[in-house]
């Protein structure tokens, strides 16, 4: 049975010192298990002194407050992650026990064309690679006419959903990446009239301001640039959480309605959370493979960290946390069903995001199936989140 710790308020300096001295004395007498941390600051001191191992075990739980709700965190690792600040080398990793109450979009469908300079009113056309979704890609070339200019820094979108004929979709023009009201919406016809904008492919042609067609339809699986990463590390109120990270970026579905994940969190809890150095694979379709490195307060776990193995050979996105490897139903890291990976939202097992991309796609992201098996989901879908962080 795991232990659960909840802190109501901060201690005075004298109380902190008395508690710390009692911990030290008890540990010397091998009685550490009889004591509990009494505050977030006290817990941080125990982590930094490497005494937390005597008191807190893997799967023990901590409770903290976010606005009017209590969030329960599991201890999933100790001294497992690398603090971003080199003056510290000790850490204790926490992850939400259940999913956050609201499912979140990883990243929104993106613009297909970026207007580096003003795009005058007139007729244009673009091609979608004939080998891509040939069932619904039913024009050899898509022609449209703008009656109003698009300013420099503006975008064109083509919101082509799944299992829909592309010929039925309208081109939307926007004055900027943050604008949510189109300048105009115009129908497409088959034709090659006017100026050619180029060919949309899965790889994209970023240098010529053309996005990957997969990201145009389903959003981006690049975690470093993702909307969900911004949400996780924001303490801002709704409407102020998201800003464009690329020239093709578009506002996520929650941009105007969701406070940042850190918004309303217990200040004493936030004071002990340090930035963690994390590694994320890049897809091999339009991001060139390899990996990105970043330092974040809150982060999603990689598929490897939840005991599912590597997405890309040679890219190590962290190591399996003891919580996932030690309590797994599986005898070795694998992608099959695992009850230890199941997480609930609203009392029901639900999908939840990893940060790892599905490497063979520009838009799909690894996720955990309600059975605990490996899955993937399109970035634009709202899926559960179970963030992690480190007391450092």
Question: What is the meaning of each model-derived region?
Answer:
Residues 18-114, 120, 150-151, 155-392:
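Collagenous Gly-X-Y triple-helix signature in extracellular proteins
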Residues 1-20:
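Short, low-complexity N-terminal tether/leader segments at secretion or assembly junctions of large
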Residues 137-138:
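Short, surface-exposed beta-strand/strand-loop-strand elements in extracellular ectodomains
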Residues 124-126:
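A short tyrosine-centered beta-strand micro-motif
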Residues 141-149:
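Solvent-exposed serine/threonine-rich low-complexity stretches and specific carbohydrate-binding patches
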